[in-house]
C-alpha cells in the first residue's frame, strides 16, 4: 500500500547536520555531542576496532546502511528510488515487512536537539499506522530506527536500539509534545530477512537515562 500524502512534522528551526563530520549545529553553534556518541560510549576498544574494520569500502556497513536507509526513506515518502542491485536481498525483505504496508508518514530522517545537554540526533522514521475504522490522527504512532546487518544469521542476533530510541523519544516529547508515541521499533534488515523488535516507549526512555548517566559520569568537571 502506498502512503497517502504525508502530513510531515515541521523541522526544528536553525538545527542542521553536517553529514561529513556528523556534527550538529543549533542556532549557529556546534553542539558538543550526538546521541550516537553517548550510546557508543559503552563500546570496548575491541568493539570499536571491529566496527572500524568492516566500515569502509563498497560493501562496508557504512555504504550498506546509507543505501538501505535511502531506499526506506523514498518508500516512506512514496517516491521511486534507484539503487544498486546488490542490495536487493535486503530491500525486498525490508519493504515486504507489514509495518510498512498501510501507514501515514509523519517524519523521516528528522533532526532533534537537546539544548540542555548540547546534543543532536536524528531518527529514521515516525509513522502512524492506518487501521480499518480508526480515524486519521487516532492510529498507533510508531517511532523507528533501521539497523542493517551483513548476514541473514545476524538478524536474529541484533539487539534493539532501546536507549537510542529513548533519546529520540525524550527530545521529541520536549520539542513536539503533541506527538504521542505508542511504540518504539528497531527494524533489523538483513539479506532475505527482516525483523521488527517492538518496545514500550517507557522502557526506551529509562534505558536512555541510564546510558546518559554512565556517559555523564565520565565527563570532565568544569
Tell what function each PLM region has.
Residues 1-120:
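Metal-dependent nuclease catalytic cores that hydrolyze phosphodiester bonds in DNA/RNA
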Residues 110-222:
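Mg2+/Mn2+-dependent nuclease catalytic core
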Amino acid at each position: 500500500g502506498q502512503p497517502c500524502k504525508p502530513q510531515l512534522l515541521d523541522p526544528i528551526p536553525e538545527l542542521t547536520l553536517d553529514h561529513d563530520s556528523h556534527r550538529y549545529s543549533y542556532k549557529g553553534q556546534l553542539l558538543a555531542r550526538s546521541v550516537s556518541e553517548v550510546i557508543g560510549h559503552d563500546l570496548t576498544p575491541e568493539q570499536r576496532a571491529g566496527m572500524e574494520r568492516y566500515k569502509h569500502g563498497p560493501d562496508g556497513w557504512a555504504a550498506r546502511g546509507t543505501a538501505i536507509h535511502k531506499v526506506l526513506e523514498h518508500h516512506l515518502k512514496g517516491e521511486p528510488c534507484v539503487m544498486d542491485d546488490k542490495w536487493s536481498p535486503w530491500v525486498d525483505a525490508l519493504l515486504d515487512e507489514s509495518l510498512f504496508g498501510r501507514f501515514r508518514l509523519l517524519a523521516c530522517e528528522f533532526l532533534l536537539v537537546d539544548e540542555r545537554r548540547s546534543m543532536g540526533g536524528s531518527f529514521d522514521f515516525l509513522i502512524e499506522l492506518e487501521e480499518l475504522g480508526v480515524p486519521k490522527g487516532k492510529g498507533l504512532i510508531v517511532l523507528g530506527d533501521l539497523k542493517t546487518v551483513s548476514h541473514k544469521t545476524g538478524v536474529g542476533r541484533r539487539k534493539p536500539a532501546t536507549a537510542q530510541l529513548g533519546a529520540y523519544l525524550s527530545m521529541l516529547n520536549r520539542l513536539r509534545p503533541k506527538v504521542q508515541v505508542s511504540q518504539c521499533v528497531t527494524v533489523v534488515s538483513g539479506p532475505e530477512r527482516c525483523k521488527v523488535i517492538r518496545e514500550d516507549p517507557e522502557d526506551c526512555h529509562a534505558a536512555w537515562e541510564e546510558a546518559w548517566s554512565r556517559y555523564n559520569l565520565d565527563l570532565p568537571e568544569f
